[in-house]
């Protein structure tokens, strides 16, 4: 057997044993498109994830510095899930969920299942019970850092509790993983960044809760703040950069950039202008942006305002981008042309004649 055949045999055996997407070539564009996904609500992020959204039946970790947009990303995923008719749960260990902001992002807060647990054990047990029920499509846990072990809560303030949280996470994830796969539920953990003490070389940053989540997560997203967005003198938002640092269902290390506007969420219009200009769906000449030969604005801010007011053109641009960048999810459906009446009558006569011949 040649090396190529032996390798192909091994790859097919691995896929059969561990599932599609468990192994691939890094430059392979044909990723596992048949994996069920929940869209992120951000086109650039759906493209970076490689399969058009977050994979169901998997664990996702989103981590970053404070106010970098981690919770916003999870709420957008919940909104997309609910639009598809799914059921979502939010385990608010930080006790900081803002219903008004969630509603602004498109979340149906009346039907969102929310829990504010007292201990880390309680939070993870609730998550496991929801997953095992099979009736939940997405569970968000905000955040790993707030999953305080019961022993730490009941102990005194100065007591040492080395490794308790890491042990708790390790036990919970061992239990959760099989149930998540079986019920095809998407479980998203929000995590925070801490600094390692005494690191002279390399990256001193790490995430809380030990190493278990790093191993069990199929996708890990690193969220960072970019530059500020100004409305005159005032800062109205900031740029967000998301890096896919781990991806088991598509090639990793891709990046997505978009704008987060304070009090509004992710700016769809800014994303459409940036991606539209990049892929020549929108023409850019100097400071002017044009669509189908018609000028839509001078500068990005004016163009954003135009798209906000003209939703029909905005939807057209969005559809064109989705079909271009995610053809496996948003393929252009060819319309089946109806047969002319003369052909229909001829085929009908032929079928009737064939039936009569069979009877004879």
UniProtKB/Swiss-Prot annotation:
Pfam families: RecA, RecA_C. Keywords: ATP-binding, Cytoplasm, DNA damage, DNA recombination, DNA repair, DNA-binding, Nucleotide-binding, SOS response. It is found in: Cytoplasm. Signal peptide: none annotated. Residues 333-360 are annotated as: Disordered. InterPro entries: AAA+_ATPase, DNA_recomb/repair_RecA, DNA_recomb/repair_RecA_CS, P-loop_NTPase, RecA-like_C, RecA-like_N, RecA_ATP-bd, RecA_C_sf. One of its GO terms (biological process) is SOS response. GO terms for cellular component: cytosol. One of its GO terms (molecular function) is ATP binding. ATP binds at residues 64-71. Can catalyze the hydrolysis of ATP in the presence of single-stranded DNA, the ATP-dependent uptake of single-stranded DNA by duplex DNA, and the ATP-dependent hybridization of homologous single-stranded DNAs. It interacts with LexA causing its activation and leading to its autocatalytic cleavage. HAMAP family: RecA. Belongs to the RecA family. This is Protein RecA. The gene is recA.
């Amino acid at each position: 057997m040649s090396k190529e055949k032996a390798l192909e045999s091994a790859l097919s055996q691995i896929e059969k044993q561990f599932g599609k997407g468990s192994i691939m070539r890094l430059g392979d564009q044909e990723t596992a498109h048949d994996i069920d996904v929940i869209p992120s609500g951000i086109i650039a992020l759906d493209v970076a994830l490689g399969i058009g959204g977050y994979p169901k039946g998997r664990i996702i970790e989103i981590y970053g510095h404070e106010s970098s947009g981690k919770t916003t990303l999870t709420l957008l995923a919940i909104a997309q899930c609910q639009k598809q008719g799914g059921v979502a749960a939010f385990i608010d260990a930080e006790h900081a969920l803002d219903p008004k902001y969630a509603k602004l992002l498109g979340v149906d807060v009346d039907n969102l299942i929310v829990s504010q647990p007292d201990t880390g054990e309680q939070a993870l047990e609730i998550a496991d019970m929801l997953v095992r029920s099979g009736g939940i499509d997405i569970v968000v846990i905000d955040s790993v850092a707030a999953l305080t072990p019961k022993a730490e809560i009941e102990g005194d303030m100065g007591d040492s509790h080395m490794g308790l949280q890491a042990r708790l996470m390790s036990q919970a994830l061992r239990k959760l993983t099989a149930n998540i796969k079986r019920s095809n539920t998407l479980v998203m953990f929000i995590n925070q960044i801490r600094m390692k003490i005494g690191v002279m070389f390399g990256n001193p940053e790490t995430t809380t809760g030990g190493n278990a989540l790093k191993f069990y997560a199929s996708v890990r997203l690193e969220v960072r703040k970019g530059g500020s967005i100004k409305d005159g003198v005032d800062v109205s938002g900031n740029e967000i950069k998301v890096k896919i640092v781990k991806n088991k269902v598509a090639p990793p290390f891709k990046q997505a950039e978009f704008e987060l506007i304070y009090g509004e969420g992710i700016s769809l219009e800014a994303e459409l202008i940036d991606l539209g200009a990049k892929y020549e769906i929108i023409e850019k000449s100097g400071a002017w942006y044009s669509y189908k030969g018609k000028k839509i604005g001078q500068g990005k801010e004016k163009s954003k305002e135009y798209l906000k007011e003209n939703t029909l053109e905005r939807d057209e641009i969005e559809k064109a981008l989705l079909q271009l960048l995610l053809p496996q999810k948003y393929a252009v459906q060819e319309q089946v042309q109806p047969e002319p009446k003369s052909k229909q009558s001829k085929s009908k006569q032929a079928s009737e004649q064939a039936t009569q011949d069979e009877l004879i």
